[in-house]
Amino acid sequence: MSNPHVNTYAPNLYAGHQILVVGGTSGIGAGIAAAFRSAGAAVHVTGATAADLQVAGEDPGLAGCSSSMVDVRDDTAVRECIDAIAHLHTLINCAGVLKRGSELDPAVFAEVVDINLNGTMRTCAASREKLRASKGSIINTASMLSFFGGSLVPGYSASKGGVSQLTKSLAIAYAADGIRVNAVAPGWIATRMTGVLQADASRSDAILSRTPLARWGRPEDVAGAALFLASPAASFVTGVILPVDGGYLVS
């Protein structure tokens, strides 16, 4: 699906820019990658498995994007991926997992946190030098669960709360390098991860009844926020956690 938000900005706003979308092979990450590609950027996406890369290869929205397999738990793999990119203007962290119902197990909890939070820190640290050279920016993916708890997903909730605080901390730490660090905080977005909830009429209705804009969000809605945060229009914006949730948090 084309992203209508791309037309909000000057044509080819991101021409000459290299964007790395970690976890950009599907869902919100793919929506963000497709939007930047449509806006003229060179985009590289990563996935954790060969199957992820196959999905990306079959997505027409990602046509023209390069890709590689990276497990964000592997510091060496993360650094090799970033070292292979000559120049980098924007790092976008979308890699994440959610294991509903099993995250009360400490081992599962630790795995989720290692991917969602520690993985975000690994990519930020590995990208710092290249982003310093370009005076670029980082966009992390927080969540509405950065703001409230989730009894079935304590690992996911803790990791996304951590991403929020990490974003604020790195915004301060990296400011002297000319690097801005922000995050999007998606609400209920229609992706494969939320497919079970979308298919359950009673649960979907409960979500929509609390959402003032009364619809499920789409990956391109989150992409619109990312296009702004990476743009010159946001040159004085750093340390922000931007909800993209149709008003869910304020209702």
List the predicted regions and their residue ranges.
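Short, small/polar-rich loop/turn modules that mediate ligand/substrate recognition or access, typified
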Residues: 175, 180, 237-239
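Residue(s) in the substrate-gating loop at a strand-loop-helix junction
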Residues: 143
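Short C-terminal tail/terminal secondary-structure segment
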Residues: 2-10, 148, 227, 238-251
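Active-site helix of classical SDR
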Residues: 124, 159, 167
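Conserved NAD(P)H cofactor-binding loop of Rossmann-fold oxidoreductase domains
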Residues: 94-99, 247
